[in-house]
Amino acid sequence: MKHSLMLTVVLLLTPLAALQAAGLKRPNVVLIVCDDLNDYVAHLGGHPQARTPHMDALAHGGVSFRRSYCQDPICAPSRASFLTGIYPFRSGDFTFRPWFEFPVLQNSRTLMEHFRANGYYVVGSGKLMHHHRQSDWDEYPYKADYGPFAYDGKERVGHPSVPEPYRSIGPVDGSFGPLSDVPFGGRGGKGWIYGAWGKVKPMRYVNDDDRDPTPDERNARWAADRIGQFAREKDARPFFLAVGFIRPHTPMYAPKKYFDLFPLKSLQLPVIKPGDAADTHYRDVFSDEIKGLRYYRTLGQSYPTVEEGLKAFLQAY
């Protein structure tokens, strides 16, 4: 079975109340969120070798905001901020604590609630808020699933093809590679599994054209099918549909053909300036064992050279 990803976005820039007051038809709105996506998108120029034709086509048909930065460098508070319109310094939400535990956010309207209050039917799937709240949605078929994961017959593990000590970081952040590299050869109850915590659901893989869909592919298919269903329905209400993709967040697994697009020898690494962080307050706030620094150091220790480790990781990204 061939897998494809259909991305559709409509950006609503006019306040809904103003549209209603003017007697104009309210548009249907699709919101797409990608986790950990940086500016390595061709039209943004973040990396000279980036190949993102569908994102480029989407950008060329609309407006691209090149200086729109995240409100917080981790996903939970950043998502809570842009889906409520409240800065972290106003809400106090800076870490991974559930956003709805903060009084300011408890008493604020989310984007989803705002659409519903203006007569929209609100549906979503995948990873949108880091901490999901079902009451925000009329439909939400699939919660965030970071899978597939490598499974050793007992538990989720780092992918066996990733060298140590990086693999020991674990099944999420310590793993990347092509889907064709089935963990443990797929024998004896081992192989790929989906990522719902507390459950073990195998993901069937024969080859890249004969396999179960990844969670992101499943969400893309749901979004495309649901949009088609809306088009056939008689419901007079406009819809707000949001779909959240996990990738390129770790674990970075993808069909092999995408790895083949970027041979390791040809990859260009970004410039890394010696002592570039020395004039910042990074180490005044964080220790050398903070996740990012530790992961970077461990990646370099896992390959013959730091450059080889960075290229392997960059290829997967």
Predicted regions span which residues?
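Bacterial N-terminal signal peptides
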Residues: 6-17
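Formylglycine-dependent sulfatase
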Residues: 2, 19-317
